[in-house]
From Swiss-Prot:
<comment type="function">
    <text>Hydrolyzes PPi generated in anabolic reactions.</text>
</comment>
<dbReference type="GO" id="GO:0046872">
    <property type="term" value="F:metal ion binding"/>
</dbReference>
<keyword id="KW-0378">Hydrolase</keyword>
<keyword id="KW-0460">Magnesium</keyword>
<keyword id="KW-0963">Cytoplasm</keyword>
<dbReference type="GO" id="GO:0004427">
    <property type="term" value="F:inorganic diphosphate phosphatase activity"/>
</dbReference>
<comment type="similarity">
    <text>Belongs to the PPase family.</text>
</comment>
<dbReference type="GO" id="GO:0005737">
    <property type="term" value="C:cytoplasm"/>
</dbReference>
<keyword id="KW-0479">Metal-binding</keyword>
<protein>
    <recommendedName>
        <fullName>Inorganic pyrophosphatase</fullName>
        <ecNumber>3.6.1.1</ecNumber>
    </recommendedName>
</protein>
Length: 25
């Protein structure tokens, strides 16, 4: 998981990303 790949966003948005994108990606 690379936080640098996703733009800054609310924590709720980050949670959604974590759910949509497997940690292994």
């Amino acid at each position: 998981m690379d936080l640098s790949r996703i733009p800054p966003q609310p924590k709720a948005g980050i949670l959604n990303v974590l759910i949509e994108i497997p940690a292994g990606s």
